[in-house]
Design a protein with these regions (language model features):
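A short, well-structured beta->alpha microelement
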Residues: 29-43
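P-loop NTPase catalytic nucleotide-binding module
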Residues: 2-28, 45-47, 54-199
Length: 199
């Protein structure tokens, strides 16, 4: 049963309409996570989520919103939505965000099925695989070829986390990029786990 985050945690969501922020808000609401309208009250936002459609890029308004939180050291997460028919993917969005937002941390990478659709996530922390069945993550050990495929990315991620320090996300110093597919639930649990770290 989903539990609610504390009433004192204020979470805001930003993103171009092409990134379907309304659908993401609903998916989070289904998990007991409330998204609040912020207006100009940025100082009291505890976390900002930035929804990105890889095919549409990141618009100037979203970049400005990201930058507006720099002075507050507000925790920020980029959610990259897998949308039907999208030509670009998670890796493309992260590359762009590294240029226009900040250095992004990628705790998970997407594993694709034979038809090219997102099928699972692999953790760069412990190299486990999260397969999603009806929106529920089933965690298993990765195969040796998966470990080899992501070895360099995992090392880079661990170095970034180590250099950022403990609780760097909550301190607004480490910016996770999370792949999400609303159709099959990929990544929603990962996003929720980050949001629940906030106090």
């Amino acid at each position: 049963m989903p539990t609610s985050t504390s009433a004192t945690v204020r979470i805001a969501l930003f993103g171009h309409v092409s990134a379907t922020p309304a659908a993401l808000t609903k998916a989070l609401g289904d998990q007991g996570i409330s998204i609040e309208a912020t207006g100009d009250d940025l100082a009291h936002v505890d976390c900002a989520i930035f929804a990105v459609n890889p095919s549409a890029g990141i618009d100037a308004e979203t970049i400005t919103a990201w930058e507006s939180f720099n002075d507050y050291l507000t925790p920020r997460i980029m959610v990259v939505l897998a949308l039907p028919g999208a030509e670009l993917d998670f890796d493309d969005a992260v590359s762009l965000a590294n240029r226009v937002f900040d250095q992004m941390a990628t705790p998970y990478l997407v594993l694709h099925s034979d038809d090219g659709s997102p099928a699972a996530l692999i953790s760069l922390d412990d190299l486990t695989i999260r397969n999603y069945l009806h929106g529920v993550a089933v965690i298993s050990e990765s195969e040796p070829e998966h470990k080899e495929l992501v070895a360099d990315f995992a090392e880079e991620y661990r170095e970034l986390v180590e250099s950022s320090g403990e609780d760097a996300f909550s301190a607004g110093l480490l910016f996770p990029a999370i792949p999400v597919n609303l159709e099959n639930g990929i990544g929603i649990d990962v996003l929720v786990s980050y949001l629940r770290k906030l106090k």
